[in-house]
């Protein structure tokens, strides 16, 4: 059975790069009918926070990236790691290193001065003398000195590293806590991971980790190192590019499936298809098709994909995601048309759920002022006669339906022998308060007959006031 995992460190937010790694691992497991595990790598006790753990859990839940096992916390497995470290020590495959931080700094500076690659020189590898006083040792793994490590990476291809290029890895800190490189190997071994999908910033650790697997008598998993996500300027993605917490995208009005659709396209493609449902991603995703080159984050593209998903998603899902934004704005959706009808009308134009909620306000809330620009352009004295006639026709309608409303507006334009725009635009401003809305007849139908007649009254008052001030 295929087994994958997502193993974030709770030392900050769950960001775009991390989510893409989680998504690729989740998709691969789903497609292969395998098992996906969430593991929290919280061994860095100084930097790990409960707030970050919660942000990871909340982000995964919002995105719908469900896991078959977990969350598993590394801090609950310290006894296991210590037993493995002791086993390596007992078998002569690990050793105490007493080099002080100052000693290591001097070593690296001397190597740089000689033009060598800075690395630990193995000075305590075969040490059997008296340990220096006052130094708490770390424990290092004895990396093989001969031979080479071959990685057949599913994304990067074959990578060959000579063991003489690798120094001896620290597997336990001076306080006895295990390091990332030890815990990740033990966890993936114990949890029988078949595929490790992670960012290519981990690729330098992989040869050392493979040697650790071999020392433990374990079969290494298959590796797939996916390239990082860059900002539009070509530098590593950071907060200024939008590498904020994934939950920020929720707050900014993105649908979770739109964000996943955008992320799956960062480094992977299927023919020339841009828009994918979750099921299509599961069916079509191929790990071997992931591009080995970095991808560029583009907010405009994300907005476009979000717009497509707003248009195509199931109306119940749209309403479920839109409702919190309506509540945030203090819009009581019980006092007005059904939110599903409003959402259906607004979904064609909105790029985000925030835009949608802003546009929906006039369906539920009356207003006393009009958008200044729209009023200046369309609520002019010349609009008074068309508005009065439309108001009269609206008041006389016995059936308040979009087609009847359309007929009334059309008839008013014909009666006055003017173009539809000279009736429609002032009417749009009158009943919505601004210059943009979906079709005026469908909008008016949802707002309601009485409200439309009353709002036209307000617009006529604004025109009167304008005439008085001119």
Curated annotation (Swiss-Prot):
Catalyzes the attachment of glutamate to tRNA(Glu) in a two-step reaction: glutamate is first activated by ATP to form Glu-AMP and then transferred to the acceptor end of tRNA(Glu). The gene is gltX. It comes from Hydrogenovibrio crunogenus (strain DSM 25203 / XCL-2) (Thiomicrospira crunogena). It catalyses: tRNA(Glu) + L-glutamate + ATP = L-glutamyl-tRNA(Glu) + AMP + diphosphate. GO terms for cellular component: cytosol. This is Glutamate--tRNA ligase. The lineage of its organism: Bacteria, Pseudomonadati, Pseudomonadota, Gammaproteobacteria, Thiotrichales. Coiled coil: none annotated. It is an enzyme of class 6 (ligase). It comes from the Bacteria.
